[in-house]
From Swiss-Prot:
This is Kinesin-like protein KIF23. The modification Phosphoserine is found at residues 155, 160, 606, 683, 685, 807, 860, 904. Gene3D superfamilies: Kinesin motor domain, Kinesin-like protein Kif23, Arf6-interacting domain. Residues 542-618 form a coiled coil. Residues 662-680 have a biased composition (Basic and acidic residues). Residues 658-695, 894-921, 934-953 are annotated as: Disordered. Residues 25-436 form the Kinesin motor domain. GO terms for molecular function: ATP binding; microtubule binding; microtubule motor activity. SMART domains: KISc. The lineage of its organism: Eukaryota, Metazoa, Chordata, Craniata, Vertebrata. Residues 681-693 have a biased composition (Low complexity).
Length: 953
């Protein structure tokens, strides 16, 4: 009869104790691979069981002092070249499997350069199984008799497990297998001969203190991270020979407990080591490997084999699984085989191999960055964000580094000299990883049911054996009683035999009683001795306890003293922090004030330099102006005197000819050798002054009349016309216009119309006219042909065949003198591909087609005026370079501080006093406008829209 079913005890609330605050560092182990050839150079040396030395091989660059560098690195354990897989498993993986069975997570990954033995360490080889098959063997050896039936535990898509009853599990088995209920096999399943040698069943390994009142289920999954994409290696995809499908990548998600998992990953329930390793081997065949220059079978992806152990307690009767989802404990052990870091200059990778190597190195670099940030946060107390999401590898195992299990790393090292630089980087990463601490996982919660429920229904006393009990042995030692039937009165044998037997039995009883008394006395003596020793121990313990209490009281006093001292120091620190804050604020204020003073000094210095440049420019401009004015006046005076002398000479010659010769003859051409030899400097125009309207009219009429007569070039064969007649003729033509022109009005006219004034001066000079002191226009008798000859003689000869192509790109010579001042204008000249020089030279001109000179002078308003003089560079006949100036650009900066009042036009007609002026009338002045029609092809026009206002009678 079964006992009544007891109530299930609820899961107690876990109080955060001191255990949750404990942290363990990441366990880093090192394994050295044997050399492929005995005569290879080695750069790694094992010092002891925890120290490894790395020295620079021959042929590498020496240190500054000429010695080879030797560096030692410490690990939790160093495994030499002769270490077996069993020794490595017992030290590294055995504790992780034991924690897995007790409900704790674990992470084990191998790290190293390519060809260092990571895959061998994790998987193994025929006859020498690696860590993975040994972990599976230990798990099934520990929970083999406590496993639940298949499909009792069922996984869902949310990284959790569900419990099914026996009936649902049976239906699920029949549905999936489509077979009747299978019988328990009489013998174990035979392993695949391809990997049978890797599973060594002779080496029995089992975890201790396995919970016998729980049932277990094992689920395995196998994924790979290839080019930062996650692929399921256990996914069954139907092969289509016509249109094969590429494997679909999986995504990472977060469950309700903030644990990361691969969504849609296949989880296979296994019941034995052979079955689990067969699933692993099926996925291993799909893993991406390739042949490289350094490794014949190089892993091109990171592989993750996860073992998920699900355990649930039995009910109060010990017959079935407890149907409560909250009581399920899920623990996971992830075995990660990282792809090796490699250098492309050694592997000679190209194409896809190069892309794979880049992604592998990038993910490993992200792992290293995460470790460095974790170490920095734990060492300095910072709160920097750990970049887990930069790589799928680190994002998947984020929970392990945040305190969800133990983390172990095996650093595989190849001791050959060619891998020295890569091994050095691996050692540095291992050094950083050892300093990272991970929170210790919490122990599994006890369900609260009575232990030993599994064996409660078995017969009391356990199984009966063949050995007799102690009371039966004692009874069998007595002699048996003889038969007591008396068949005859004279029977004398039965009674004596019975008496003899009873005497023997009585003797044995006395012996046993004596023995019992002796044993009782001995037991009493032992009990007294035990009591005495116990009292002595109690006294000793009491003495020790008193001593400890005294020590504790002393330590409490010391703690109180230290706490008071700590409070005092904290108060001092707080005061110092406040003082430091005040000093820092004063320092910032002083720095800001210093910066403002520096800026002010810089502005004053720049203003001073600008003022000096302005004054220097004004002085230079004034001196040049007066120098040019003096030269102009001297040249004008010389020219006037020469003209007067020439006129007098001509008159004297004519008079002499008239007096000496009776007949009029052809006058000889005067000698011009003196005038040709003497070069008359070009006079500078006088300062511009406005002209009055009357003077402008006179000058314009005079220019029209002056332009009418055309002087022809004289030759020796011309008619005999006297010079005096020519002079008189010109004087008669100029007599109506000989009114002197006001200098002030002429200057004003030139200021208003500088372009016209320049044109007049040039045209007058070409016609042979010059301005005298009386501002009279005197014609000279230089011919047009002479002017052309003089012009051709003064210009630089330029060959026509050296004309530059207009389609070719031009290059400039940017001539900026060293005395120029840097302006702060927004608009700055920008010439690409220009050669900037401070002094023009032939080398720079030979390379360019354009020339520009930046000239600065002081304007009338006191500001700096920058002129950019542009020109074309040509080759001369002599092999040199010449510049023909073509354009001038003026850059000027002014302040908009002028008067808002419009200045009246100087061309407004003067009105007599007392009359109203139409020029000042608003209606009259606004009746004229410049207008341009929308859509018109013509330019702006001068339009008149309104009638001027009538005058009052």
């Amino acid at each position: 009869m079964k006992s009544a079913k007891a109530k299930t005890v609820r899961k107690p609330v876990i109080k955060k104790g001191s255990q949750t605050n404990l942290k363990d560092p990441v366990g880093v182990y090192c394994r050295v691979r044997p050399l492929s050839f005995p005569d290879q150079e080695c750069c790694v040396e094992v010092i002891n069981s925890t120290t490894l030395q790395l020295h620079t091989p021959e042929g590498y660059r020496l240190n500054r002092n000429g010695d080879y560098k030797e560096t030692q690195y410490s690990f939790k354990r160093v495994f030499g070249t002769h270490t077996t897989q069993k020794e490595l498993f017992d030290v590294v993986a055995n504790p992780l499997v034991d924690d897995l069975i007790h409900g704790k997570n674990g992470l084990l990954f191998t790290y190293g350069v390519t060809g260092s033995g990571k895959t061998y360490t994790m998987t193994g080889s025929p006859g020498s199984g690696g860590l993975l098959p040994r972990c599976l063997n230990m798990i099934f050896n520990s929970i083999g008799s406590f496993q639940a039936k298949r499909y009792v535990f069922k996984s869902n898509d949310r990284n959790s497990m569900e419990i099914q009853c026996e009936v649902d599990a049976l239906l699920e088995r029949q549905k999936r297998e489509a077979l009747p209920i299978p019988k328990t096999p009489s013998s174990k399943r035979q392993a695949d001969p391809e990997f049978a040698d890797m599973i060594n069943v002779q080496e029995f390994c089992k975890a201790e203190e396995v919970d016998e009142d729980s049932v277990y289920g094992v689920f395995v999954s196998y994924i790979e991270i290839y080019n930062n994409y996650i692929y399921d290696l256990l996914e069954e995809v139907q092969f289509d020979p016509i249109k094969p499908k590429l494997p679909q990548s999986k995504t990472l998600r977060e469950d309700k407990n903030h644990n990361m998992y691969v969504a849609g990953c296949t989880e296979v329930e296994v019941k034995s080591t052979e079955e689990a390793f067969e699933v692993f081997w099926r996925g291993q065949k799909k893993r991406r490997i390739a042949n490289t220059h350094l490794n014949r079978e190089s892993s091109r992806s990171h592989s993750v084999f996860s073992i998920k152990l699900v355990q649930a307690p039995l009910d109060a009767d010990g017959d079935n699984v407890l149907q409560e989802k909250e009581q399920i404990t899920i623990s996971q052990l992830s075995l990660v085989d990282l792809a090796g870091s490699e250098r492309t200059n050694r592997t000679k990778a190209e194409g896809n191999r190069l892309r794979e190597a880049g992604n592998i190195n990038q993910s490993l670099m992200t792992l290293r960055t995460c470790m460095e940030v974790l170490r920095e946060n734990q060492t300095y107390g910072t709160n920097k964000m750990v970049p887990y999401r930069d790589s799928k590898l680190t994002h998947l195992f984020k929970n392990y580094f945040d305190g969800e299990g133990k983390v172990r790393m095996i650093v595989c090292v190849n001791p050959k000299a060619e891998d020295y630089e890569e091994s050095l980087q691996v050692m540095r990463f291992a050094e950083v990883t050892q300093e990272v601490e991970v929170a210790r996982p919490v122990d599994k919660v006890i369900c609260g049911l009575t232990p030993g429920r599994r064996y409660r229904n078995l017969p009391r006393g356990g199984p009966v054996g063949d050995e007799p009990l102690v009371p039966e042995v004692i009874l069998q030692s007595f002699p048996p009683l003889p038969p007591c039937k008396l068949l005859d009165i004279n029977d004398e044998e039965t009674l004596p035999k019975l008496a003899d037997t009873l005497e023997k039995r009585h003797h044995l009883r006395q012996l046993m009683t004596e023995d019992l008394n002796k044993k009782c006395l001995a037991f009493k003596a032992l009990l007294k001795e035990f009591d005495n020793s116990l009292s002595n121990k109690e006294n000793y313990v009491q003495e020790k306890l008193n001593e400890r209490e005294k020590v504790i009281s002393g330590q409490k006093l010391e703690i109180e003293r230290l706490e008071k001292k700590n409070k005092t120091l904290e108060y001092k620190i707080e005061i110092l922090e406040k003082t430091t804050t005040i000093y820092e604020e004063d320092k910032r204020n002083l720095q800001q004030e210093l910066e403002s003073q520096n800026q002010k000094l810089q502005r004053q210095f720049s203003d001073k330099r600008r003022l000096e440049a302005r004054l220097q420019g004004m002085v230079t401009e004034t001196s040049m102006k007066w120098q040019k004015e003096c030269e102009r006046r001297v040249a004008a005076t010389q020219l006037e005197m020469q003209n007067k002398l020439w006129v007098k000479d001509e008159k004297l010659k004519q008079l002499k000819a008239i007096v000496t010769e009776p007949k009029p003859e052809k006058p000889e051409r005067p000698s011009r050798e003196r005038d040709r030899e003497k070069i008359i400097p070009r006079s500078v125009s006088p300062s511009p002054l406005p002209l009055s309207s009357n003077n402008i009219a006179q000058i314009s009429n005079g220019q029209q009349l002056m332009s009418q007569p055309q002087l022809h070039r004289r030759s020796n064969s011309c008619s005999s016309i006297s010079v005096a007649s020519c002079i008189s003729e010109w004087e008669q033509k100029l007599s109506p216009f000989s009114t002197p022109v006001n200098v002030t009005s002429l200057a004003r006219h030139r200021q208003q119309e500088p372009g016209q004034s320049k044109t007049c001066i040039v045209s007058d000079r070409r016609r042979g006219m010059c301005w005298t002191e009386g501002r009279e226009m005197v014609p000279t008798f230089s011919s047009e042909i002479g002017v052309e000859e003089d012009h051709c003689r003064r210009n630089t000869p330029i060959p026509v065949r050296h004309r530059r192509s207009r389609s070719a790109g031009s290059r400039w010579v940017d001539h900026k003198p060293a005395s120029n001042v840097q302006t702060e204008t927004v608009m700055q000249p920008h010439v690409p591909h220009a050669i900037t020089v401070s002094v023009a030279n032939e080398k720079a001109l030979a390379k360019c087609e354009k020339y520009m000179l930046t000239h600065q002078e002081l304007a009338s308003d006191g500001e700096i005026q920058t002129k950019v003089i542009k020109g074309d560079v040509y080759k001369t006949r002599g092999g040199g370079q010449s510049v023909q100036f073509t354009d001038i650009e003026t850059l000027k900066q002014e302040l908009p501080t002028g008067s808002r009042k419009r200045r009246s036009s100087t061309l407004a007609p003067a009105q007599p006093d007392g009359t109203e002026s139409e020029w000042t009338d608003v209606e009259t002045r606004c009746s004229v406008a410049v207008e341009m029609r929308a859509g018109s092809q013509l330019g702006p026009g001068y339009q008149h829209h309104a009638q001027p206002k009538r005058k009052k009678p």
